Amino acid sequence: MTKSNNDFEDIARWRMDFCREFGVTINDEEYFIDKVQTYGYREIIYQYLDHFIEGNSEKVRPNTTFEEIYAFYQLDQRLKNEALIDLQLFEQTFKAALIDVIELYVAQLKAKKFNFYQESRLKLEDLLKEKYVMQTGRVIRRGELRSRIRRIKENYLEPFDGYNYLYSNEITTWVLIKEMSFGVACNFFFLLHHKQQAIILKRVFKNDLSLADFEKVIESMRYFRNRAAHNYSLLIIKNSDDEFLYNTVYKSLLRLKNQEPARRMKSNFKDIINNYLEEYPKEKNYLPSLDQLKLSNLLKDDAYENGCIDWNARG
């Protein structure tokens, strides 16, 4: 049995009553109903009401309006979207290095393994280790990666018109890595041999980075992206090191040789936060991004020959 519009209106009234019990002022009931039905009552209230609770009280700060809570929700959305773009720039840099190193490695392996007249196809075992055990205990296996590669090969998109004709319907390393999710590309990296891993890390990061440190960087980025993908709050969430997630992302981006993502994050976060504070100046005393999050510091700071590899070969 489907709910009628009257049922949903009743639910909206109950929700307004609940918010008012916490001391939230609702000046425009239609605005409240529109926003909670459009974006989700729990998305806005459950995730962001705590920010406005006063001390150990069960009430929000005096004169807190629903409009303020919704604006705080929107602030997190804007910061989240900006951070995701900056992480995407990092992903592009990482994948570019991964592609170049793999193509060179494939060419070197082919030169050693085959003579000029042999069909020069490599197996996945020629390129990757059987498994890699991360510090968290998670095991990355070559066999699992092979199944991902097979699905990509069966379903990849043409990057430009005529690609399949040019490459005789063979997937190149470029398209293979391009089609991988960030997580799968990282798994591919961890299964590479140490020499190739070291070359990639040196190309991507400013200072020497150990594999263990890289694991931490990647895991923090994955956690951030997973929370963002499911629209969980990020402004008031800390990682296992008691650090707010936006700050973790920014610190990771500062380690890159390509400083465009960090510069962009700093500049755009500054604009987003300042625009928010212009409308809600009293939030300067409460906003985590200017206090515990320590983004106030942020506001102050100023190819190779294509290798041919049989990605579906057994081994």
Locate the predicted segments by residue.
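Extended intrinsically disordered or low-complexity regions, especially N/C-terminal cytosolic tails and loops
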Residues: 1-223, 235-315
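Acidic/aromatic/glycine-rich contiguous surface patches that form carbohydrate-binding/processing clefts
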Residues: 231
